[in-house]
Amino acid sequence: MSFSMSRKQYADMFGPTVGDAIRLADSELFIEIEKDYTTYGDEVKFGGGKVIRDGMGQHPLATSDECVDLVLTNAIIVDYTGIYKADIGIKDGMIASIGKAGNPLLMDGVDMVIGAATEVIAAEGMIVTAGGIDAHIHFICPQQIETALASGVTTMIGGGTGPATGTNATTCTPGPWNIHRMLQAAEEFPINLGFLGKGNCSDEAPLKEQIEAGAVGLKLHEDWGSTAAAIDTCLKVADRYDVQVAIHTDTLNEGGFVEDTLKAIDGRVIHTYHTEGAGGGHAPDIIKAAGFPNILPSSTNPTRPYTINTLEEHLDMLMVCHHLDANIPEDIAFADSRIRKETIAAEDVLHDLGVFSMISSDSQAMGRVGEVIIRTWQTADKMKKQRGKLQEDNGVGDNFRVKRYIAKYTINPAIAHGIADYVGSVEVGKLADLVVWNPAFFGVKPELVLKGGMIAYSTMGDPNASIPTPQPVLYRPMFAAKGDAKYQTSITFVSKAAYEKGIHEQLGLKKKVKPVHGIRKLTKKDLILNDKTPKIDVDPQTYEVKVDGQLVTCEPAEIVPMAQRYFLF
């Protein structure tokens, strides 16, 4: 016997379905559900008088071997793979199934079994994304990790040793001793971590020992001297060990111009940090590197998006982070050469075109570790308002644009750093690093942050209250962040060379340790929905940016979404 419901009744009970559109926070971005893998009339839902009860939606005979450990019911999945509705089953901390959950004794088409061993997260009306990946971290203080987790970031890659002067300016963990200590420190945190060694050296031996000590890659930074010899040597070693090289190029053009750096790179794959140049790099035209097929370009979030306040705040940030002196004219000139409104404005558009592939933070070193996700969506919203719907978005929603932008902080940094087999998307076989969002707070404040299939961070009310919701509602660490649970739900990434030498056993690491791989044969074409390689030119006098001969610019935003409406401070 069939039963009819209005679309509103259905959405209230089981969440939106195919044909429904959902607004993302207070932005002008809308998503439209492309497919619904749950079965109408056989949906599972938890609660008093609901479906997931013994002998109904819950299999009465299934043991733990036959059912999932956790199911997220009726979730709206937003991922580079699509925007669709499904149940998500998690087993042993991994995404085991995406589709229809329930009891196959009563229901057709069940992909994952709910049993007595299954926990439930009711995701009706909620958006689920992969945990964010921030691939430009200065590990200046451990408190960054809590802030990142609370924003929906579950993987951090970068370098540093704490608030040392070198770390404040450069993302390097230099030398085996420092790398080993940071690998040991990583044990404390319910987050995936990987550390970059110092790549600025014109001899191979000091670089090799860092990779064999556990570095996932090497970082070249102008403050250590990004010379042609250092670049070439670093890339030779990286090719041998299959690790990534990240680079912050020579702002002052002391050792050469952008053309000289590209010549030294010589077609080899490299991750270029803050490729627009405001965060550093060849002035004024490092941005043209984004047009080459071996360059994997990223932005950092202080320039995301370009607003009326962007230029003003950058000078002071730069003076502090790069140990400059306001009393020295040369230092002021150095700072001024970086901060160019023309290239920052072009950066917005290049992201929207899919030319810039990734967004990261540059944490506490001219970047905000808790705002990667917010600023990504603020940029997407600004571009829709200024440039209109993308040609690929011919329906009600902005699905293509949303998939392009979410790839910038999930799958693409995972691909670039050789960890896409483990994290970076909502796909079967990957670590269940998932973020659950109320659509009204999407991109701003997650409801739940899962690490390896267990809740690590969550909004939580007064612990002494009779229910979970009374004020003050704060982000608090949950059980996945405690005790030995964090060892089973998070990964420390190392080089394949270090993994094969048993670095985890040598250092007594309890956390899961996995090797990075598949990096040196990458090209920009491997970066999903953000793989464009146009010809980019910069006028050396006016700093105007042209893409395939066309001027690319935009106006600064005066108002952005996901801002003061959501925060007191």
Swiss-Prot record:
From the UniProt record, give the pathway where this protein acts. Nitrogen metabolism; urea degradation; CO(2) and NH(3) from urea (urease route): step 1/1
N6-carboxylysine modified-residue sites: K219
Q: Where does substrate bind?
A: H221
The protein's predominant localisation is cytoplasm
Write out the GO cellular component annotations: cytoplasm
Q: Note whether Cytoplasm occurs among the keywords.
A: yes
Reaction catalysed? urea + 2 H2O + H(+) = hydrogencarbonate + 2 NH4(+)
Report the cofactor remark: Binds 2 nickel ions per subunit.
**The protein's assembly and partners:** Heterotrimer of UreA (gamma), UreB (beta) and UreC (alpha) subunits. Three heterotrimers associate to form the active enzyme.
The molecule here is called: Urease subunit alpha
